[in-house]
Structures are given as C-alpha cells and as structure tokens.
C-alpha cells in the first residue's frame, strides 16, 4: 500500500485550514478588540489542536480509520452511532463550505450563486475522482498558490492599521475561546482517515497538527483583522475593493475546494463504517452532490450553533478515546457496545450543554474534557466488568 509522507499530510491540512469558513468565524472575534481576540484565538487553538494531535496519533499507531478508532472505545454500536453523526456533520460542512464559497465568488463575479455552487461542487467531484494518494502535484500547485494569495490578502486587510470598530461586550472571552476550539474540534472525526496511511505516524500527526494550527490561527486573524481594521466582514468585498480580481477568485475557489474535499472524502470513509456494502468514493461523491443541492436551496449564514453542537458531541468522545488509549491502555475490540464509555459520553454531552450557560474564561471544552476523562477513569476502576462488551 502506498503510504503518505509527513510533508503530504502537512499539505493536506494546510489546504483544510485555508478556508472562507475559518475567515468568517474570525470576524466574530472583532467585539473583543485585537489583543483579547488574538489571545482567545491562540488559547482556543492550543486546546483544540492538542485533541486533534491525540486523535490523529491513535489512528496513526493503529492503522485504523477515524471511526475504526472510535470502535476501540465504544464498540460496534457506538461506532455506528458516531459514524452516522459524523456523516451528518460532514454533509453539513460540505453544504456550508460550498455555500460560503459560492456566495463569496459571486461577489467577485456575479453570474449567480447557484452557478458557483455547481462549479465548486464539480471541482470537488474532480478532486475525489483523482483520489487522496494521487493528488501530490495538484496539491503542491494549489497550496503554493493559496500560500501566496493568502499573504496578499493578509497585506490588504492589515495595511490600514487603524481600527474601524470599537470593542464591545457582545461576545465574552470564554465564548470566543470556544469558537476557536470548535474548528480544530470539528476535524477530530477525520484526521485518522489520513494519518492511518502515513509512513511515520508520529511525524505525520505532528506535521498535520502544527500546520493546521498555525494556518487556522492565521485565517482567524485575517477575519478578525478585516472586521476590526476595515469595518467589513465580507472578505470577498474587501478583495474586490482592493482590485484583486482573478486572484480573489483563485483564493475563494481553491480554498473552498481543498477544504471541502476533506469533508466529502471523510464522509465517504465514515459511511463505509455503517455498512461493508458502501463504497467510500461513491459515498463521497453522493455527499458532494447533496451538499451542492443544499447550498443552492438553503441559507447558511450563521454557523455558531452548528459549531457548538459539534463540540458537545465530539469533545467528550475524544476525551474518552484519549483516556482509553493513552491512560488506561485498553486495547482490542469492545464487542457490540462498551456500556461504561457510552454512559460516560452521555454525561459528558449533558455537561457540555450545561456549561454553555456558564461563562468560563477557557471555554466549555477544556473543563468538559477534564471532567469526562476523570469520570472515565473512575468508572472503569469502579465497574471493570461493565467495561466489557454488552
């Protein structure tokens, strides 16, 4: 089997991080002001990327897909449950990314949002058809172009240097941290789909984590800077006013395609976990078509509640996986259902939703994960028999 290098994995996650969704999420941080906003972005990404790293390392060391690693901790039924939720969130992400990309490109060249949805959807289909292992030269060209164009965009946003907005209290620091955690958290059910095929699992996971973390912070910073220094939250409009033209189109289309490809591709892999009869590549193509249709038909302008929902589902899930694999070192399959871990996950999910009503400076994810990990350790010490397959 052809293995991927650490450099290739880094390129994949560079493409994932450069996205309109990340820039748009960054605009939400403007009410904090530049210094507090930057601190919230950095703190949130440190928390989120730590989980991202451990999730990827489990896949790299076991050679299992993301949902395969979930089965190690939750059993077959648990795997099916999270695989179904993951497919749903990835269909959602595919729709959101195509919607945002089409809306932005239509600002640059107004031929109709639905036309751009079809163009972007078609390019994602092409990416899937080429395949993750054959994207080498295509990815290198796309990433080089995105890197240069992102620098240009950064210069355009920050060259004014004078804030056009005044900080206010509409967003708390803790809520901002949670928005920063949410983006790397949303990739947790995907990263093992790529690190499992790495030549050097640890190096590839570290490369993926550092690349994604740094570039994602950069995208958030561009979004926040745009809102603070230009008073404009529409990145496409900023690029049009700066006269970027074709460069703007390239940024918007390439960033959308390279990110959304990962969503659709991993949706296909997760779908394979639901049934052996499902072909991952065909499933990914179907997800892309569904995402394109949804992007044409439905408005998707505010994704904050979607991000919080992802956090409440996957933060306690990865907390249990980390505890199982690295602390308790429980290896092997869990049969149909690991009842102990399933109950702990439900408690972790409920706790996250409760914590959403509490303003915590470090956000909800960190305390929720700490509590879930502690509950997991205690539960397996008190009820070792219940940890066996049900």
What do these predicted ranges mean?
Residues 319-390:
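C-terminal membrane-solvent junction of multi-pass transporters and transport-like membrane proteins
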